């Protein structure tokens, strides 16, 4: 029996992982990606350069045979290192077992490895520089614009899976066609990435095997280690208000904020002001959508279905779990795609909404529990809740 061909929108993290699962089951897959091939061109996605990989994501990478390779380039983080205002630190271990460790991984390297893994199956092709403009779910037709020439092309599909992120065009088509429930909830806070570089003798400046957190009430700073001995820091901060991205603008503003709220970081970040002023400010929002499919034709996974605030990697791990669950359902129902899509949408919607809620709760708890030492223990959540 000939296997149907799948069309996937988006070659970020979820897309090529799902393609590998499908290829292992004998399906041919064509992925359309709006960006150039990052393995050939240096591109910026405007997003975190490292992510926290936990048990949900680890299990998925094991299933496609990529975990050991990724682990070799990952840094284990055995707990949260809480930084008080006075410079004191408190390590909160995640646990004693190996699966209670999370890993700092490079988004870019992971993305490239996932694409290469998918292509090596011989059943997956990736068409870069193709931006989806619209989807006609009745006619099974997609319209793309070539980002390097502005030419528009049409492509037909049999089954299409949207892995195209929080601004998903396929989700828009499904919502319009099904009157699906859809809400995008802005958090009112944004984020900006900063850097703690290696020391002069090319070593880590702070403890590498921990996820560092500076909770400060209405805002917070976190830092994850990189394999080049640097740390990627993320400042979660109000978008508007008296102390916000709207008001912290000048060199004086930036230094005042960090010297008063994160004093132990200033000496570690020689390019603090430059990074703050030049790096983009990302917004924080959660996406709630239901259902995630249209008939047996179209399905959403990952951020396209359930975007969450970018907080300690829930998005990636939950997206990877989506791929694993869908793979299991394909095995369970064979080629009954109506049953597969229905079951996936029914079971995963609740999980997706729960993870989105949990991400916000974690963020609010972590940033607000600053002056209460008792709360630090309270915040040591089980690793299977994605930290």
Named regions from a protein language model:
Residues 2-4, 328-381, 385:
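C-terminal helical "tail/cap" subdomain of flavin- and related membrane-associated enzymes
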Residues 4-81, 98, 102-109, 158-159:
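Glycine-rich FAD cofactor-binding loop and adjacent beta-loop-alpha segment at the N-terminus
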Residues 9, 32, 163, 301-302, ...:
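Active-site flanking residues adjacent to catalytic metal/cofactor-binding acidic residues
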Residues 88-105, 236:
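Helix-loop-beta segment of a Rossmann-like dinucleotide-binding subdomain
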Residues 116, 130-134, 139-284, 288-293:
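Conserved FAD-binding catalytic core of PHBH/FMO-like flavoproteins
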Residues 121-132:
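A conserved beta-strand/loop element that lines the FAD pocket in flavoprotein oxidoreductases
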Residues 312-321:
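A conserved FAD-binding loop/helix module that cradles the flavin
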């Amino acid at each position: 029996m000939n296997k149907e061909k799948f069309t996937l929108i988006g070659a970020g993290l979820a897309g090529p992982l799902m393609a590998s699962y499908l290829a292992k089951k004998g399906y041919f897959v064509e992925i359309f990606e709006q960006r150039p091939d990052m393995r050939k061109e240096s591109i910026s996605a405007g997003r975190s350069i490292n992510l926290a990989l936990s048990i949900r994501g680890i299990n998925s990478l094991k299933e496609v045979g990529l975990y050991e390779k990724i682990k070799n380039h990952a840094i284990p983080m055995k707990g949260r290192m809480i930084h008080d205002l006075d410079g004191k630190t408190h390590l909160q271990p995640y646990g004693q077992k190996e699966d209670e460790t999370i890993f700092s991984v490079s988004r870019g390297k992971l993305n490239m490895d996932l694409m290469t893994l998918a292509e090596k199956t011989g059943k997956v092709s990736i068409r870069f520089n193709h931006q989806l403009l619209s989807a006609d779910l009745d006619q099974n037709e997609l319209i793309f614009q070539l980002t390097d020439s502005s030419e528009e092309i049409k492509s037909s599909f049999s089954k299409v899976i949207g892995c195209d992120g929080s601004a998903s065009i396929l989700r828009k088509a499904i919502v319009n066609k099904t009157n699906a429930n859809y809400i995008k909830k802005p958090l009112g806070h944004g984020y900006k990435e900063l850097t703690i570089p290696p020391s002069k003798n090319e070593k880590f400046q702070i403890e590498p095997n921990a996820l560092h957190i500076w909770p400060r009430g209405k805002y917070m700073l976190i830092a994850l280690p990189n394999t080049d001995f640097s740390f990627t820091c993320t400042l979660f901060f109000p978008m508007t208000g008296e102390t916000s991205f709207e008001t912290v603008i000048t060199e004086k503003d930036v230094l005042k904020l960090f010297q008063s709220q994160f004093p132990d970081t200033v000496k570690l970040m020689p390019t603090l002001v430059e990074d703050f002023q030049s790096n983009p400010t990302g917004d924080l929002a959660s996406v709630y959508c239901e259902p995630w499919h249209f008939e047996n034709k179209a399905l959403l996974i990952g951020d396209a279905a359930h975007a969450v605030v970018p907080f300690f990697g829930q998005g990636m791990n939950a997206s990877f779990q989506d791929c694993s669950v869908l793979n299991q359902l394909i095995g369970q129902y064979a080629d009954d795609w109506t049953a597969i899509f229905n079951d996936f949408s029914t079971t995963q919607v609740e999980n997706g909404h729960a993870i989105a809620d949990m991400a916000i709760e974690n963020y609010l708890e972590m940033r607000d529990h600053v002056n209460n030492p008792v709360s630090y223990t309270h915040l040591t959540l089980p690793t299977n809740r994605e930290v």
